């Protein structure tokens, strides 16, 4: 609470660019940076290890009334639940609308350039691993990508 209380005074002593560098250094995003689908990476997964992932549809409302969308993959070891991934991504991509589709697990082995996609999410159901594999293959073209419907 002390930090929140002191924030106006702290901000007044920092110039805006220094504050943005500080936020970026601590892995925070300013929401106004994510105002269009073109600025959203299709794949953001941890560089190694075994972790949960989800597929998410991201929508952008345009003046014509249509809602263009993209499907993205997100997976992080730091998230214990698939819903934690969704909550983090939704906050980061605001004001874009997000819709969780389903989830699973990823085993990422960078030494051998292999990614294995498998399992399901108890909360969101089993993701279409073919869609996930296609997105990941585009981001990691030199990797061998495998999928399985086995395991949790």
Question: Model-derived features: where do they sit?
Answer:
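Intrinsic low-complexity, intrinsically disordered or marginally ordered coil/linker segments
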Residues: 2-152
